[in-house]
Amino acid sequence: MKFSVYRYNPEVDETPSMQDVEVEVPEGRDLMVLDLLELAKAQDPTLTFRRSCREGVCGSDGVNMNGMNGLACITPVSDVARRGKLVIRPLPGMPVIRDLVVDMGQFFKQYEKVKPYLINDEAPPAQERLQSPEERARLDGLYECILCACCSTACPSYWWNPDKFVGPAGLLQAYRFLADSRDTATDERLAALEDPFSVFRCRGIMNCVSVCPKKLNPTQAIGEIRTMLLQRGT
């Protein structure tokens, strides 16, 4: 099979380029995109990409495949190849360190802004802080984020303002703790989100929903935060 992969080594290359690669695919097998990259790397060890778990858990191998962000390890080639063509690029909107490896620093800075951890100023209980089944169920679809950055790097608002806009991944986690019955920092969290580059920078394009490998819905979470902010102001 032939495919094209983005190549760029800032130590030696003046500009990025696309490299055509041909690998031998076992007959009758639908490989994952990561398998193609591994086969290509066996031919050219200088090809650089991130990967770890191979099961869609670690979130380290996010790439852009024929214009769609996703995890290479759980994306079948047949899902993204079009007329036998496949182009693999790094996640868009982030500085490239080398080939398919991007600098995630800005992404994690935005994530850190929302304080993605439980805040509770009450005296610690003798045992764990309990939740009812209904309270626990409110967190489903919020806590499963694996920080792969596929959503934020598919978002035009994030492309335009990566140093200001929190992005869908961060805002999903902001709502995850706003929705947590054990968290006591609701006012503090909402006050921090009253910012023109927070939830109201989202344009509802829903690219984030389309590319999330965990089938989460950051757009819905952002809408919930907007509702809370509006109710807080009345």
Q: Language-model segments: which ranges?
A:
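Short beta-strand scaffold segments in enzyme catalytic cores
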Residues: 62-63, 155
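Ferredoxin-type iron-sulfur electron-transfer modules in oxidoreductases and energy-metabolism complexes
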Residues: 30-45, 84-234
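Short, structured protein-protein interaction patches enriched in aromatics and acidic/basic residues
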Residues: 53-62
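Glycine-rich phosphate/adenylate-binding loop and adjacent beta-alpha elements
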Residues: 68-88
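Short polar catalytic/cofactor-binding loops
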Residues: 5-11
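Short strand-turn-strand beta-turns centered on an Asx-Gly dipeptide
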Residues: 24, 64-68
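Short, contiguous acidic and Ser/Thr-rich linear segments
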Residues: 18-31
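Short structural boundary motif marking the start of a folded domain
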Residues: 1-3
